[in-house]
Structures are given as structure tokens and as C-alpha cells.
Design a protein with these regions (language model features):
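Two-component histidine kinase catalytic core, primarily the HATPase_c
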Residues: 42
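Phosphopantetheine-dependent thiolation modules in NRPS/PKS and related acyl-activating systems
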Residues: 2-38, 47, 52-80
Length: 80
């Protein structure tokens, strides 16, 4: 498993834990708004948790248009 795959898997695990769903219900290309039925405030909660977990800060401009786990993981990787 390469680095981006590990990051994707960790993001999926964090999302599943945060929203109390089974990890196997989520896939990298899922739109998290649609798949989890969340709103923008709930997405911000997840992003805060992700930033804390990876010890990074993702600027707002890097998150515009990010709605799937794979793209979020790519943004995280760019900060590690």
C-alpha cells in the first residue's frame, strides 16, 4: 500500500468513526455530503478532526470543491 492509499484509508477510518458508520460503507470516491448525508458544518467538524489527526492545517482555498475522500487525502498529502 503506497502513501496516498494509506492516507485515504486513514481518512475513511476517521470519517466512519466520526459519523458512526461502518468503514466498509465508504469508498475513496464517495461524495461525503451525499454518502453520509451531512451538511457543511458537519463537514467542517470532520475536516477539523482530520487536521488534528495529521497535525496539519488545510487552508480554505485548498478545500473549495473538495467533496470526496480521495481528493481530501490528496490535499492532506500535499501538506505532509
Amino acid at each position: 500500500m503506497n502513501t496516498i492509499d494509506k492516507t485515504i484509508e486513514e481518512v475513511l477510518r476517521l470519517a466512519a468513526e466520526h459519523f458512526k458508520v461502518q468503514r466498509d460503507q465508504l469508498s475513496p470516491d464517495d461524495d461525503f455530503f451525499k454518502k453520509l448525508g451531512i451538511n457543511s458544518l458537519q463537514a467542517l467538524d470532520l475536516l477539523t478532526r482530520v487536521e488534528q489527526h495529521f497535525h496539519i492545517e488545510l487552508p480554505d482555498y485548498e478545500l473549495q470543491g473538495v467533496t470526496d475522500f480521495r481528493t481530501l487525502a490528496q490535499r492532506i498529502q500535499s501538506r505532509l
